[in-house]
Amino acid sequence: MARTAEVVRETKETQIRVWIDLDGTGVSTISTGIGFYDHMLESFARHGGFDLKVETKGDLHIDMHHTVEDTGIVLGQAIHKALDGFKGIRRFGSAYIPMDETLTRCAIDLSNRPYLIWKVEFKRPKVGEMDTELFKEFHHAFAMNSGACIHLETLYGDNTHHVAESGFKALARALRQAVEIDPKTGGQAPSTKGVL
């Protein structure tokens, strides 16, 4: 059964379409109007092994906040939809990602109990034209809408680009593990409750 989903969301601030295949090969087409954000989402798709299409048109004449946060919302919703009740998956995933002087770790529980622990610090307020505070907004929106409990922590690192990118890669690799089909579940939700 294909684990794909498409979600469209339109507000007065943004118009977004996201399509994802959880069992893809990491091919992506990303267009948000924010170059560095596109780069991060491309990295997320590649290292997660997800085929991903993102088309976002946002009110960038105001700032990048709505575009970044709302794209996180819709991406999270698409993953939640593609998981179809979280049946048969491994549920848990974790990753350590080094990027030159930076080391970031991420642990995920696809529990349908969304939560974000964010221990990431940036030494500069911007990377490219993007405000670094928006990375937390993305991850929070993504967690709340995907049903994921995410713990993301940069253990050390100086370069702002590396800190941001290692975070997206760590999220991708941890999520890749968590969404994997686990034959031991017999197609059931991996919980003593029987549902997630």
UniProtKB/Swiss-Prot annotation:
Keyword terms, alphabetized: Amino-acid biosynthesis, Cytoplasm, Histidine biosynthesis, Lyase
A Pfam family that the UniProt record links to this protein: IGPD
Coiled coil, from the record: none
Main EC class the enzyme belongs to: lyase
GO molecular function terms listed in the Swiss-Prot or TrEMBL record: imidazoleglycerol-phosphate dehydratase activity
Record has Amino-acid biosynthesis as a keyword: yes
Pathway(s): Amino-acid biosynthesis; L-histidine biosynthesis; L-histidine from 5-phospho-alpha-D-ribose 1-diphosphate: step 6/9
E.C. numbers: 4.2.1.19
Any one Gene Ontology cellular component term annotated for this protein: cytoplasm
Cross-referenced Gene3D superfamilies: Imidazole glycerol phosphate dehydratase, domain 1 (3.30.230.40)
Gene Ontology biological process terms, A to Z: L-histidine biosynthetic process
CDD domains referenced in this protein's UniProt entry, alphabetically: IGPD
InterPro entries: IGPD_sf (IPR038494), ImidazoleglycerolP_deHydtase (IPR000807), ImidazoleglycerP_deHydtase_CS (IPR020565), Ribosomal_Su5_D2-typ_SF (IPR020568)
Locations listed in the record: Cytoplasm
Record carries keyword Amino-acid biosynthesis: yes
Catalytic activities: D-erythro-1-(imidazol-4-yl)glycerol 3-phosphate = 3-(imidazol-4-yl)-2-oxopropyl phosphate + H2O
Family: Belongs to the imidazoleglycerol-phosphate dehydratase family.
NCBIfam families according to UniProt: PRK00951.1-5, PRK00951.2-1, PRK00951.2-4
Record's protein name: Imidazoleglycerol-phosphate dehydratase
Gene name of the record: hisB
